[in-house]
Amino acid sequence: MSECTHNCETCGKSCSERKSAADFREPAHKLSSIKKVIGVVSGKGGVGKSMTSAMLSVLMNRRGYHTAVLDADITGPSIPKLFGIHERARGDENGVFPVSSKTGIDVMSVNLMLENEEDPVVWRGPVIAGAVKQFWQEVIWKDVDFMFVDMPPGTGDVPLTVFQTLPVDGIDVVARPQELVSMIVAKAVKMANMMNIPILGIVENMSYISCPDCGKKISIFGESHVDEIAAKFQLPVLAKMPIDPRLAQNADAGCIEQFEGDYLDGAANAVEALLK
C-alpha cells in the first residue's frame, strides 16, 4: 500500500482523512447580485469567441433579461468595439460602474479603463489575472440575470483564475470546422472537467457560407468534425454559425446589437435553462 502524501487533490481514493478541495471563489461586489455566470472559451484564437459572447448577451437581453459582459481577454479586448462603446468607465468611492450599451447591456473591459483604446496592455500573467478578479469584485454590476465572461483563448492564467474565482455555472466552447480543432477543443473541455465546470455545449463558428444565388451550403474550411467531437465528450452541438458578411459589418460598425438571425438560438436556450 502506497504511503499517503496528504495531497487530496491528486488522489483518487476515498479515506477517512480525505479533505475537501479548497474553495477559492471570491464574492462579487456587495452592491452586485449576479444570478448566472457563463464562460465563453476556445482552445485557440480567431474562432469568433468574442462575437459569440456579444451575440449571446444580445439574445438574452432581447428575451427580457438583464445581461452583462465581463471582458476577461485583457490583452486582446474586443467587446467594447463590438458594442460601439468608446467612453471610459467611471466610479465613485464604492467602486467602478460598467458602461451600458445602446440597449442596456452592461460591459466592463480593460479598454474602458485606458486613456487611448489603442494602447497595448503589456502585463505579466499574475497582473492580468488580478485585473480579472477586480472586474468581478470591484465593479458595481447591480442586478444581473446572466453575465457572460469572454475569456482569452487557451488554458492559461485567466481561464484558471475565472474557473477558480467566479461561480461559473457553465461554459460554451467555441470552435471552427477543422480536424486540428478537435485536439484544441479537447484541451478546453478537459480543463473544464478538471475544474468541475459544467459544459453547456459546443458552438461551431464559420461552419459554412450560403451561396447567395442557390442557397447551397459551402464548407469553406473543410468538412466539419464538430459532431464527432461532441459525441466523444457527450456534449450537445448548440449551434453551427455560418460565415455571414452582415455579422462582420455589424461588428465593424459597433452595431452587434442589430444582428439578425437565429444561429445561436440553441445556445441561448441552453443558457436560459440555467434559471429553470
Q: Can you say where each PLM-predicted feature lies in the sequence?
A:
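Inter-motif core of Ras-like GTPase G domains
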Residues: V139-I140, P159-L180
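Phosphate-binding loop that captures ATP/GTP phosphates
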Residues: H66-T67, A72-E117, A129
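Phosphate-binding P-loop
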Residues: H29-K35
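Phosphate-binding/switch loop-helix module in NTP-utilizing enzymes
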Residues: L114-V162
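Residue-level signature of catalytic and energy-coupling elements of molecular machines
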Residues: I34, G45, D71, I79, ...
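C-terminal lobe/tail of nucleotide-utilizing enzymes
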Residues: M1-A22, V189-K276
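Walker A/P-loop phosphate-binding motif and the immediately C-terminal alpha-helix
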Residues: K36-I74, V189
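Glycine-rich phosphate-binding loops of nucleotide-dependent enzymes
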Residues: M108, V132, M151, Q164, ...
